Regions:
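Function-determining surface determinants
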Residues: 1-494
Length: 494
């Protein structure tokens, strides 16, 4: 399976629109002659269009240079990741490898043909002075058919996709097209093909003070789904983002639990804890492997006695392979789509009507709990103090997530408090990393000793971690005081 990142924009023009001369746009010196192709794509989705509604598009396309199965998933910065697979038989349905990648978006439900898009394409390449392809511009004469309700549409579209060019080039081409009468189209061809059916789904959060809370919770659910495909393939950033989203969602359901059915909310939180645990095994192994690899390579050569880096690399690679296999098994298990389905029922169903004071009381309670837990932790030394600081960190995460809910309505004051909570949380996280790293080093040192290897370097790294941890508390105290200044909390007391 091939994976590519697409950065493109789409434009539509009235009848009679003609592609303007694009030379001079962002370093474009030459525009190639057009090459023509006839493309025929069938888009697959669930009966309630879950894939499209969650930013996914699954199609089997014939014609053109990249015929086959394509799964497109939204990515950071407006880009889209496309997973490509050979076309195979038209009757066989999506290959298992792609089916695994849509399991979150589809909620494990079957996908069937939803729309057909036939497209006559004329494609040109935009070249710089060295003959390098900066972008490809495709003029498409499109005919779509909704394979469920039979609705058909036709339109003319221009698609600009970056190759070796940058966003400035896209902006320059967009300006040239706009001057020629084109309008940027914010939705894909597949969205336009089933627009009437999509209009029947209202995915907006409810109005009123509960709206931002529900909207925030839905964003976390959507982040879980949006990162599923990349996390399934072991992408470090996706695993991290998916884990953070599950944690944010779990904290939100707890902080604002009066908005939803309490029993169902607790059950969903338990399942999110399970998912977060599976993601955490992978992420923690990735982070610890990188952390210790850097620590070993930062030492002078004369202080590295024995094959320390190689041994750690081998063991972490084995641990990561095991954790990744366990994560894939979890995402392949029916428990995972069942969790997402329960989340849909909870978050898309009716929420209790509350006023803003109710929301702010819950935020203040989360903040007070975090403050109290940190003050208690700072009064305790030794291993018990380390455990208490870790618990305080978790409380501040919950407080930060609660405040994030109000950023849209409280504006800059809430954003400032979020930023200061994040700084405090990061310091507490650095301390916890040191605690965990020391335990990992101790465990690996014992194993090295049992295998007859020199353990000096493990002990040295352990001592350095302990020394660094000794400087954490003064920094934590300063960061704590910054979070408690009246200027950053006044808005919560209104």
């Amino acid at each position: 399976m091939a994976t590519v990142v697409e950065r493109e924009r789409k434009f539509s023009g009235d009848d009679g629109f003609r592609l303007p001369d694009l030379t001079g746009c962002g370093g474009v010196v030459t525009v190639s002659d057009a090459t023509a192709a006839d493309l025929d794509a069938v888009y697959w989705d669930t009966d309630d269009l879950r894939l499209l509604r969650s930013g996914h598009a699954l199609r089997r396309r014939t014609g053109g240079h990249d015929a086959g199965w394509h799964l497109k998933v939204g990515a950071v910065g407006g880009a889209r990741v496309e997973h490509q697979f050979p076309a195979g038989s038209a009757d066989a349905g999506p290959p298992p490898e792609l089916a695994a990648l849509i399991r979150g978006a589809s909620r494990g439900r079957p996908v069937t043909p939803a729309a057909r898009i036939v497209n006559h394409r004329r494609e040109r390449r935009l070249l710089d002075a060295d003959g390098r392809v900066l972008a490809e511009v495709a003029e498409d004469d499109v005919r779509s058919e909704d394979l469920v309700d039979g609705a058909t549409r036709t339109w003319h579209e221009v698609e600009v996709e970056l190759v070796d060019g940058d966003e400035e080039l896209l902006d320059a081409v967009a300006a040239r097209l706009a001057a020629a009468g084109a309008r940027e189209v914010p939705v894909s061809k597949s969205h336009r093909a089933v627009a009437a059916r999509l209009a029947g789904f209202d995915d907006r959060p409810p109005a009123g003070p509960a709206g931002p809370v529900v909207g925030y919770a839905r964003e976390q659910r959507d982040a879980i789904v949006g990162n599923h495909a990349a996390a399934y393939q072991g992408d470090e950033d996706a695993v991290h983002d998916m884990r953070v989203a599950s944690r944010r969602l779990r904290a939100t359901l707890r902080t604002f639990r009066g908005l939803w059915d309490r029993r169902e909310g607790e059950a969903v939180r338990a399942e999110l804890r399970w998912l977060g645990g599976e993601l955490g095994r992978v992420r923690d192994t990735q982070v610890m492997a990188a952390r210790l690899d850097t620590a070993v390579h930062d030492l002078p050569d004369e202080l590295v006695l024995g094959p320390v880096a190689a041994r750690l690399g081998e063991r972490f690679a084995a641990d990561l392979a095991e954790a990744t296999a366990a994560l894939r098994a979890a995402l392949d298990d029916d428990r995972y789509p069942d969790l997402l389905t329960r989340l849909d029922r909870l978050l898309d169903g009716p929420a209790r009507e509350v006023d803003r004071r109710w929301v702010d009381r819950r935020i203040r309670r989360a903040v007070r709990r975090a403050d109290a837990r940190l003050d208690e932790a700072l009064a305790v030394d030794g291993p018990a103090g380390d455990v208490a600081l870790h618990e305080a960190r978790k409380k501040y995460k919950a407080a930060r997530y609660a405040v994030e809910v109000r950023k849209a309505t409280a504006g800059r004051p809430a954003a400032r408090l979020v930023k200061r909570f994040k700084a405090l949380q990061d310091l507490l996280g650095t301390h916890q990393d040191s605690v965990v790293t020391r335990e990992v080093l101790r465990r690996h040192a014992l194993r090295a000793y049992a295998e007859g290897e020199n353990t000096f370097t493990y002990g040295l790294l352990h001592a350095r971690q302990a020394e660094a941890a000794g400087h954490d508390r003064p920094a934590v105290l300063r960061a704590r005081d910054r979070t408690r200044r009246r200027t950053v909390r006044r808005w919560l007391d209104r």
